[in-house]
UniProtKB/Swiss-Prot annotation:
Residue ranges of domain OBG-type G in the record: 160-328
Cofactor(s) demanded: Mg(2+)
EC number(s) per entry: 3.6.5.-
CDD domains: Obg (cd01898)
BP terms from Gene Ontology: ribosome biogenesis
Residues binding Mg(2+), per UniProt: S173, T193
Keywords: ATP-binding, Cytoplasm, GTP-binding, Hydrolase, Magnesium, Metal-binding, Nucleotide-binding
PROSITE patterns in the record: G_OBG, OBG
Name of the protein: GTPase Obg
Assembly with partners or alone: Monomer.
Organism: Prochlorococcus marinus (strain MIT 9313)
Domain Obg residue range list: 1-159
Length: 329
């Protein structure tokens, strides 16, 4: 399934039905009064979070969403039927903004959360509404009002507690695959991961914690280089970051600083987020080189370092123990 995390749509609420002019014309009612009914209200457009959806793919092919109009009023003071609300399903984690102003309308984070994004127009008034002591046969009635129409920006931010970040080819996808049931595409070249991968890792209590493998960052990502900040947004909601470094890289210390710089540049307090620093591919290092590299990375980051080999399954229990400690599990 194609992963789409941004969409632009137009929502158009229903128009209110017109009121009508009518008079009672019944046998034995020689002085029948006004009986024109009011129009029904137009339908609203409502977004609903659906926990079964993972992408905004549906909005790639359909972008206009009109709600039904209200029906016109009827004789005998009958009010027209109101238009049904149009319910649009979106994934949990969807932010909704006005397209041109950027104003945040809502953030649908839990399944069945609802957000009315366009209100239907009010129905018009029938002439029965204008009956008064001075005017016993009013001919006035009003048309229904137009519903609201808005251009919206939908933006999906994954609901993961733990985000796995690092430069391309650091081993993030391998790590999430061995920690969870996720099976991301894995190969030895940059940008294998082109979309975020989600995996559920079991806590000691048996409950699941969602981990997200975020596509590799590069220098300038916060300004849009490489895969850009299209996927940086997906770590905004995380409680903990796991920064994976490639132990076989030419200069892991420089790699560390590149990602640190991008987190600072992107903002949203990401650089202040609790973070575990992980050196992957431990099997590629001899003891002397490993000790030197650990000292250099800890000095550059001010953090302790966790050594693992995701491919060989080394150090994973210790890593998870630190994850649960940081999350307070």
């Amino acid at each position: 399934m194609q992963f789409i995390d941004q969409a632009r749509i137009t929502v158009r609420a229903g128009r209110g039905g017109d009121g009508i002019m009518a008079f009672r014309r019944e046998k034995y009612v020689p002085a029948g009064g006004p009986s024109g009914g009011d129009g029904g209200n137009g339908g609203n457009v409502v977004l609903e979070a659906d926990g079964n959806l993972q992408t905004l793919l549906d909005f790639k092919y359909k972008r206009l969403f009109p709600a039904p109009d209200g029906r016109r009023g009827g004789p005998n003071r009958c009010t027209g039927a109101s238009g049904k609300d149009l319910i649009i399903k979106v994934p949990c984690g969807t932010e909704v903004r006005h397209l041109y102003t950027g104003i945040l309308l809502g953030d649908l984070t839990r399944s069945e959360d609802l957000l009315v994004v366009a209100f239907g127009g009010r129905g018009g008034l029938g002439n029965a509404h204008y009956l008064s002591n001075r005017n016993r046969a009013p001919e006035k009635f009003t048309e229904g009002r137009d519903g609201e129409e808005w251009f919206l920006q939908l933006e999906l931010k994954l609901l993961a507690e733990v985000g796995i970040i690092g430069l391309p080819n650091a081993g993030k996808s391998t790590l999430i695959s061995v920690l969870s049931a996720a099976r991301p595409k894995i190969a030895d070249y940059p940008f294998t991961t082109l979309v975020p991968n989600l995996g559920v890792v079991r806590r000691p209590s048996g409950d699941g914690t969602v981990f997200a493998d975020i596509p590799g960052l590069i220098a300038g990502a916060a300004q849009g280089a490489g895969l850009g900040h299209d996927f940086l947004r997906h770590i905004e909601r995380t409680r903990l970051l796991i920064h994976v470094l490639d132990g076989g890289a030419e200069d892991p210390v420089e790699d560390l600083l590149v990602v640190e710089k991008e987190l600072v540049a992107y903002g949203h307090d990401l650089v202040e987020r609790p973070r575990l620093l992980v050196l992957n591919k431990q099997e590629l290092l001899d003891e002397q080189h490993q000790d030197q590299l650990v000292d250099a990375l800890q000095a550059a980051s001010g953090r302790s370092l966790i050594l693992i080999s995701a491919a060989m399954g080394l150090g994973l229990e210790g890593l998870l123990a630190q994850v649960w400690k940081e999350l307070g599990v």
